[in-house]
Amino acid sequence: MAHATQVGLQDATSPIMEELISFHDHALMIIFLISFLVLYALFLTLTTKLTNTNITDAQEMETVWTILPAIILVLIALPSLRILYLTDEINDPSFTIKAIGHQWYWAYEYTDYGGLIFNSYMLPPLFLEPGDLRLLEVDNRVVLPIEAPVRMMITSQDVLHSWTVPSLGLKTDAIPGRLNQTTFTATRPGVYYGQCSEICGANHSFMPIVLELIPLKIFEMGPVFTL
């Protein structure tokens, strides 16, 4: 999870997040090189006296600065399109969980376990235990298995919300009257935090998401016992 003074992205807990971090580094390297070359050209322009203000035509230069940006855009677009395809791919999920956004809490339904339904509210500061995180803890965590593909079906009961867990690389809008879906496969056990990422009213900041990822064998004993 994120911590104070953190500069980089959160540690990846799914293959999709690993791909996103790699793409971030790839794009950042290209942007850094472009910025360096532009600043270097500006520096030379300001410091050298060997400038010619009478140039009216330079076909070679125009060809270069047309083709080069196109190549750079392709180098950025191709990895981005690959990740976009991976995020939309649904690979025979082992479990399906439904998340419903409300003002201002989340409701969850384990459709594969007899329709187990529960609400997840943020814990007020008075109920926090030592070591708990302010504005991020909930009364009922979402318990899911690791190393198994999980499908999240996300919708809203009232206004626009967004179900987001950064460590898993997930951000899916919850739209009234529409059922969006996303999949992920967690690679490490632990407790992971997220929040509603779509402004949804006065208490938008009080809609945390907490996932407790556990080994598959423990999960198969029954998620109801770990809530």
Swiss-Prot record:
Gene Ontology BP annotations: ATP synthesis coupled electron transport
SUPFAM superfamilies with a match to the protein in the record: Cupredoxins (SSF49503), Cytochrome c oxidase subunit II-like, transmembrane region (SSF81464)
Mitochondrial intermembrane topological intervals: 1-14, 88-227
Localisation per UniProt entry: Mitochondrion inner membrane
Membrane topology: Multi-pass membrane protein
Annotated Cu cation A2 binding sites: C196, E198, C200, H204
CDD domains: CcO_II_C (cd13912)
Keywords: Copper, Electron transport, Magnesium, Membrane, Metal-binding, Mitochondrion, Mitochondrion inner membrane, Respiratory chain, Translocase, Transmembrane, Transmembrane helix, Transport
A Pfam family recorded for this sequence: COX2_TM
Membrane-crossing segments per the record: 15-45, 60-87
GO cellular component, one term: mitochondrial inner membrane
Residues where Mg(2+) binds: E198
GO molecular function, one term: cytochrome-c oxidase activity
Cofactor notes: Binds a dinuclear copper A center per subunit.
Reaction(s) catalysed by this chain's protein: 4 Fe(II)-[cytochrome c] + O2 + 8 H(+)(in) = 4 Fe(III)-[cytochrome c] + 2 H2O + 4 H(+)(out)
Predominant location category: mitochondrion
EC number: 7.1.1.9
PROSITE patterns associated with the record: COX2, COX2_CUA, COX2_TM
Segments on the Mitochondrial matrix side according to the record's topology features: 46-59
Sequence positions that bind Cu cation A1: H161, C196, C200, M207
NCBIfam families, per database record: CoxB
Quaternary structure (record): Component of the cytochrome c oxidase (complex IV, CIV), a multisubunit enzyme composed of 14 subunits. The complex is composed of a catalytic core of 3 subunits MT-CO1, MT-CO2 and MT-CO3, encoded in the mitochondrial DNA, and 11 supernumerary subunits COX4I, COX5A, COX5B, COX6A, COX6B, COX6C, COX7A, COX7B, COX7C, COX8 and NDUFA4, which are encoded in the nuclear genome.
Functional summary from the UniProt entry: Component of the cytochrome c oxidase, the last enzyme in the mitochondrial electron transport chain which drives oxidative phosphorylation. The respiratory chain contains 3 multisubunit complexes succinate dehydrogenase (complex II, CII), ubiquinol-cytochrome c oxidoreductase (cytochrome b-c1 complex, complex III, CIII) and cytochrome c oxidase (complex IV, CIV), that cooperate to transfer electrons derived from NADH and succinate to molecular oxygen, creating an electrochemical gradient over the inner membrane that drives transmembrane transport and the ATP synthase.
Family the UniProt entry places it in: Belongs to the cytochrome c oxidase subunit 2 family.
Name assigned to this protein: Cytochrome c oxidase subunit 2
Taxon lineage: Eukaryota, Metazoa, Chordata, Craniata, Vertebrata
